[in-house]
């Protein structure tokens, strides 16, 4: 009986070391990207970010194109409520700008806060869920990691202030084929 308990403890401890305390429910991707064999997406693309699975998926006119591992704000994957809560917002957005970034290689900004974000924010204020003087925040987007820290993505370590972070090579690929105006859905 002692050996079963010891084995279980070692197994649990090892999994926490490898995956961290907040690994995604679907770890089958092992933080690798997957994509169709075609070299680039066909026609209009859209992006779906699944916070529970730690995945950013790209769809084009043929359907699914690619999936990349990503991480978010704080370890709690709840919806963003206000500025400073380190949460990644949920909802429907668009890419509004693209630029080279001095820290994170590239930055694809989304239109947070948009009308949907403001409606949720004001409803939360009205219900007293957030302070009356809270602000909604902004400057949310998709970006890379700190230089030489792509391993953070492999370990599913949430570290941003609310943005979506991905490995440098994956980000450069996404940046190359994603136009301004692209639809981005972020869900839990």
What are the residue ranges of the model-derived segments?
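Positively charged n-region of N-terminal signal peptides that target proteins for export
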Residues: 1-4
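Bacterial Sec-dependent signal peptides at the C-terminal "C-region" and cleavage site
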Residues: 12-29
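N-terminal post-signal-peptidase region of extra-cytosolic proteins
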Residues: 31-46, 51-52, 72-97, 124-128, ...
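Well-ordered beta-strand positions in beta-sheet-rich domains
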Residues: 46, 67-69, 92, 139, ...
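Short Gly/aromatic-enriched secondary-structure transition segments
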Residues: 63-75
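Exported/periplasmic cell-wall-interacting domains
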Residues: 99-188
């Amino acid at each position: 009986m002692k050996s079963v308990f010891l084995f279980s403890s070692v197994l649990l401890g090892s999994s926490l070391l490898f995956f961290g305390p907040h690994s995604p429910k679907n770890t089958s991707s092992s933080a690798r990207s997957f994509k169709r064999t075609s070299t680039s997406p066909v026609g209009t693309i859209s992006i779906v970010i699944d916070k529970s699975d730690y995945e950013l998926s790209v769809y084009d006119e043929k359907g699914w194109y690619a999936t990349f591992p990503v991480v978010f704000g704080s370890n709690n994957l709840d919806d963003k409520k206000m500025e400073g809560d380190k949460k990644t917002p949920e909802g429907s957005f668009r890419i509004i700008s693209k630029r080279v970034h001095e820290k994170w290689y590239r930055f694809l900004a989304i239109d947070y806060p948009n009308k949907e974000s403001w409606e949720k924010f004001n409803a939360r204020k009205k219900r007293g869920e957030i302070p009356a003087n809270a602000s909604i925040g902004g400057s949310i987007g998709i970006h890379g990691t700190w230089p030489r820290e792509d391993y953070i993505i492999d370990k599913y370590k949430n570290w941003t202030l609310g943005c979506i972070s991905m490995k440098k090579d994956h980000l450069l690929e996404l940046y190359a084929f994603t136009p301004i105006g692209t639809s981005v859905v972020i869900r839990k």
